[in-house]
Regions:
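Helix-turn-helix
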Residues: 23-50, 54
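Residues in soluble alpha-helical coiled-coils and helical-bundle/repeat scaffolds
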Residues: 46-50, 72-76, 93, 184
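Short coil/turn segments at alpha/beta junctions that flank glycine-rich nucleotide-binding fingerprints
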Residues: 20-23, 95
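A general secondary-structure boundary signal
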Residues: 11, 28-31, 44, 68, ...
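Alpha-helical structural segments
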Residues: 4, 8-15, 19, 33, ...
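An extended, acidic
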Residues: 78-208
Length: 208
């Protein structure tokens, strides 16, 4: 199956999940919305559990792609980390799967695939990846921190500065996650992040 066709199946599954609990989502209905046979759906994902894993993997990848965009949107280091925190809060507010992945709170309406890898005999590379380990909340903290450090650290940055940068990046992520659980007041997550980070982070790291 072409990647676009797989995406249409995942879109159909996501739409079904928005409308009803995952336990009430039927494979035959997902296939019908996507315009394929139920057997085609099973050939691609293996099972409803496989479909759930693929959907969670896609939403995880989408969230991390948004992190990359946020980090690239500004020159100022604090602005980049604030934008990343804003994206995290917005993505969690607008996407129940992202919220569940970042907090570990799945709820009865959502699929709850095991985060550890499952046996896979799929011939579909994308499904084999989905059947591998899925990120836990602590994994997302590390993934976002590592992405931020890679973007924000200049070539030749001293190790001590890189360590401090990593701490600040993780702080921004954890502030964002706290705002997912308890929405912030006036000023939002942006003010919280900018206030918490050292003032020197208002300049590019290679100017510190």
């Amino acid at each position: 199956m072409m990647p676009a066709a797989r995406e249409s199946l995942l879109d159909a599954a996501y739409t079904a999940l928005v409308r009803r609990p995952w336990s009430a989502v039927r494979m035959v209905d997902v296939a019908a919305v996507a315009g394929v046979s139920r057997q085609t759906l099973y050939n691609e994902f293996g099972s409803k559990e496989g479909l759930a894993r693929a959907l969670v993997r896609r939403e995880a990848d989408g969230y991390l792609a948004g992190v990359d965009r946020a980090l690239a949107a500004h020159a100022d280091t604090r602005d980049r980390l604030a934008a990343t925190a804003e994206w995290t809060v917005a993505a969690s507010r607008n996407n129940a799967l992202v919220r569940a992945m970042l907090t570990g709170c799945w709820g009865e309406r959502l699929p709850a695939p095991t985060l550890s890898a499952v046996p896979s005999s799929s011939a579909v590379p994308a499904q084999r990846r989905a059947d591998g380990p899925l990120p836990a909340p602590t994994d997302f903290v590390a993934l976002v921190r590592e992405r931020a450090v890679a973007v924000l650290s200049a070539p030749g940055t001293p190790k001590s500065d890189t360590v401090e940068l990593a701490r600040s990046c993780e702080l921004a992520v954890r502030i964002a996650l706290s705002c997912v659980a308890a929405p912030p007041g006036e000023g939002g997550v942006t003010d919280l992040v900018r206030t918490a980070l050292p003032r020197q982070f208002g300049r590019p790291l290679n100017h510190l």
